[in-house]
Amino acid sequence: MVCIPCIVIPVLLWIYKKFLEPYIYPLVSPFVSRIWPKKAIQESNDTNKGKVNFKGADMNGLPTKGPTEICDKKKD
């Protein structure tokens, strides 16, 4: 059985997005833009900026020491 909030909350969000947001958003957006001003994203022309040397680190960024073993099966 599904709980009441699991049904009611998505329906209320859909009603808000479909019917209320088009009227409320134009009223609220000037205040929000004053609180959180957008800053321009500056693009750099440096081609080496995105490249990182991964020597000595595994894929999740943690340093590796010696061989790592990955087992997919349980050992009894």
Swiss-Prot record:
Residues 1-37 are annotated as: Necessary for its localzation to the endoplasmic reticulum and lipid droplets. It is found in: Endoplasmic reticulum; Lipid droplet. It is linked to Glycosylphosphatidylinositol biosynthesis defect 25: An autosomal recessive disorder with onset in early infancy and characterized by global developmental delay with almost no milestone achievement, brain anomalies, hypotonia, and contractures. Death may occur in early childhood. Undergoes ER-associated degradation (ERAD). The lineage of its organism: Eukaryota, Metazoa, Chordata, Craniata, Vertebrata. Belongs to the UPF0729 family. Keywords: Endoplasmic reticulum, Lipid droplet. GO terms for cellular component: endoplasmic reticulum; lipid droplet. This is UPF0729 protein C18orf32.
